[in-house]
């Protein structure tokens, strides 16, 4: 029997299935991106205001070169150990903020903040280039699952890792070029990936320019540039099946642009040294850390201290006294501390030789430091573990013709680790390598194929959460730094009461700009000699002592202490400055007699050639 139902009018009723709500997360990732960048910049600006004093001998050398740039003393700027671009940035900041010696650190912290903004731009350029190459290399007929992280998610991740690095090894208080180097290396790598994605020669040229600027920041980029050019040619030929002449032409264009930017400085340095020279820092550090060559005050007759290096010194330190070693630095007319202003001057003609017996233990120690760095940056690895738990899979197809977009940046990042593991590894050296390996690895993550599309939303949400937590943690740290300043009643984060107090006390004694002084001990002479720059004086004589021996003990154990003091006095320095353990300089014994405490700090000064009355003209900065 067939039942017929009467239609009562209107359209017939249709069965409707529930439709999924539109995916709003990508929309909010795009909308929140400018706000997140603003928050990241804001908390980093807080670091620039409140980060504590972290000045060392390297920082003073960069500041001194910046002074020479402002004075247009081009001969003094050419330096085989420190490159000029970061000092030029410091000089620009000094000029913009109209700084004096006593407040210049504020300007330099602001320069570091500007470099952080450049790093953010470089991160965006790098991640966007990664995604562009990834999408263009993906075969539309590929049966592989889609990629897990989109362009904006990778941006958040990159800035998040940068912000964490700024909390640690690349902090605002470190007046060093590593952050600027990282920015230019990232821009160079981004240009390389853009060229691989588009075949446009302008990106090869931009790569050469960015790497040239990286070289002017730090000579490490000289070797890295050639690795990038080789990677460009090999990837174009082997993976993209381009003709060899076209790939080589792009590499030559990058090399020409690099030479245009870096060539004049290399030519000037080579002329100064009398040989082709792009920088001596790598060679000297290899000699010091691997070959076992003596680092400080090496003399031509100290053959037992040459280690495995070949040594033919052209202008070693002038030794005034052998026991203890008293050294004069009058040969070099530049720098607050000429000994560290240009280490390549005093150690010219040291040629390091590779020795596997010496290399192996050094490399093992460097690998341990790399593992320690990875352990000290667990956030990214924990994120990777969470993404694997929600279904992410890492499929790295490296075969020619495959979508191996990740291969070039990961190999170049690994190259950074390999280069530094041959000599010496510090966290700030390998931060770029960490980014160059990690971000492409995250970009290569795909869905497992068995997980719904919602897994991508979960992955993006986890990355966003980590990025916001990094901003929140930075805000907490900045707030704590600000509270500490109020408790200590310090005028600024960059202010160190001992260092600034010692400099003002020296000025009050009549020691000021244009004067020379002597020092004793590694703390006063090398590690914390910013007091001399603040006071406006140059350290031209040093009583050298081993780092492990306290200064007071070294003075007490000198059988010829009076002869040593007379030798130092004969060099014309106004005072002898040392950094002493608090409480030992009582003034009641022959060792401490005559020494003057400098403004309740651990710094003390022994008058040598002071005028009868302090000069008021030199008492102010």
Which residues make up each language-model segment?
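Signature aromatic-anchored transmembrane alpha helix within multi-pass, membrane-resident enzymes
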Residues: 30-38, 152-156, 206-209, 225-237, ...
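Extracytoplasmic catalytic/substrate-binding loops of multi-pass membrane glycan-assembly enzymes
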Residues: 51-65, 76-93, 99-106, 273-280, ...
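Membrane-embedded, lumen/periplasm-facing catalytic core of multi-pass transferases
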Residues: 70, 272, 276, 458, ...
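Lumenal/periplasmic acceptor-binding loop at the mouth of the active site in multi-pass
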Residues: 74, 91, 102, 293-398, ...
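Short acidic/glycine- and proline-prone juxtamembrane loop motifs at membrane-interface regions
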Residues: 82, 167-180, 220
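Transmembrane-helix motifs of polytopic, lipid-linked glycan transferases
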Residues: 107-146, 187
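Membrane-interface transmembrane helices that cradle and orient dolichyl/undecaprenyl
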Residues: 148-149, 188-204, 214, 236-240, ...
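Short periplasmic/luminal acceptor-recognition loop of GT-C membrane glycosyltransferases, typified by
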Residues: 303-319, 495-546, 574-582
């Amino acid at each position: 029997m067939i039942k017929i139902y009467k239609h009562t009018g209107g359209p017939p009723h249709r069965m409707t299935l529930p439709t999924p709500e539109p995916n709003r997360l990508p929309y909010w990732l795009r909308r929140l991106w400018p706000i997140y960048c603003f928050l990241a910049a804001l908390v980093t600006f807080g670091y620039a205001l409140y980060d504590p004093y972290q000045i060392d001998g390297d920082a003073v050398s960069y500041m001194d070169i910046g002074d020479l740039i402002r004075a247009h003393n081009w001969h003094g700027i050419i330096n085989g150990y420190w490159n000029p671009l970061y000092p030029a940035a410091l000089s620009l900041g000094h000029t913009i903020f109209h700084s004096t010696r006593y407040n210049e650190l504020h300007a330099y912290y602001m320069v570091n903040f500007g470099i952080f903004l450049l790093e953010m731009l470089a991160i965006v350029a790098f991640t966007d280039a990664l995604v562009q190459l990834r999408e263009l290399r993906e075969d539309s007929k590929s049966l592989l699952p889609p990629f897990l992280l989109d362009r904006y998610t990778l941006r958040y991740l990159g800035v998040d890792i940068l912000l964490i690095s700024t909390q640690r090894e690349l902090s605002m208080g470190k007046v060093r070029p590593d952050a600027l180097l990282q920015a230019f290396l990232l821009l160079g790598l981004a240009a390389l990936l853009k060229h691989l994605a588009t075949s446009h020669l302008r990106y090869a040229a931009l790569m050469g320019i960015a790497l040239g600027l990286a070289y002017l920041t730090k000579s490490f980029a000289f070797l890295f540039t050639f690795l990038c050019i080789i990677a460009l040619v090999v990837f174009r030929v082997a993976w993209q099946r381009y003709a060899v002449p076209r790939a080589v032409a792009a590499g030559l264009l990058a090399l020409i642009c690099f030479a245009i930017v870096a060539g004049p400085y290399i030519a000037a340095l080579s002329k100064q040294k009398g040989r082709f020279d792009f920088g001596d820092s790598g060679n000297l550090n290899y000699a010091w850390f691997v070959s076992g060559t003596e680092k400080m005050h090496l003399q031509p007759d100290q053959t037992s201290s040459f280690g495995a290096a070949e040594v033919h010194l052209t202008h070693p330190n002038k030794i005034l006294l052998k026991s203890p070693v008293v050294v004069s630095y009058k040969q070099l007319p530049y720098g607050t501390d000429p000994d560290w202003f240009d280490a390549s001057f005093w150690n010219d003609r040291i040629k390091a030789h590779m020795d596997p017996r010496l290399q192996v233990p050094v490399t093992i120690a460097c690998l341990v430091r790399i593992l320690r760095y990875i352990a000290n940056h667990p956030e990214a690895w924990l994120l990777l573990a969470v993404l694997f738990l929600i279904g992410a899979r890492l499929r790295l197809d490296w075969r020619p013709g495959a979508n191996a977009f990740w291969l070039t940046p990961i190999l170049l990042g690994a190259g950074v680790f390999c280069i530094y593991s041959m000599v010496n590894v510090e966290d700030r050296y390998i931060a770029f390598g960490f980014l160059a390996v990690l971000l492409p690895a995250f970009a290569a993550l795909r869905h497992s194929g068995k997980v719904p599309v919602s897994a991508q939303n979960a992955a993006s949400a986890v990355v966003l959460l980590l990025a916001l937590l990094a901003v929140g943690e930075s805000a907490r740290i900045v707030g704590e730094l600000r509270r500490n300043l109020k408790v200590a009643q310090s005028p600024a984060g960059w202010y160190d009461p001992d260092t600034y107090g010692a400099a003002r006390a020296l000025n009050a004694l009549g020691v000021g700009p244009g004067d020379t002084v002597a020092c004793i001990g590694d703390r006063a002479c090398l590690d914390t000699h910013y007091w001399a720059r603040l006071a406006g004086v140059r350290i031209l004589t040093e009583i050298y002592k081993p780092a492990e021996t306290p200064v007071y003990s070294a003075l007490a154990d000198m059988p010829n202490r009076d002869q040593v003091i007379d030798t130092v006095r004969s060099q014309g320095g106004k005072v002898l400055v040392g950094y002493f353990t608090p409480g030992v300089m009582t003034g009641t014994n022959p060792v401490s007699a005559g020494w003057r405490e400098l403004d309740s700090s651990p710094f003390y000064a022994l008058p040598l050639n002071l005028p009868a009355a302090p000069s008021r003209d030199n008492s102010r900065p």
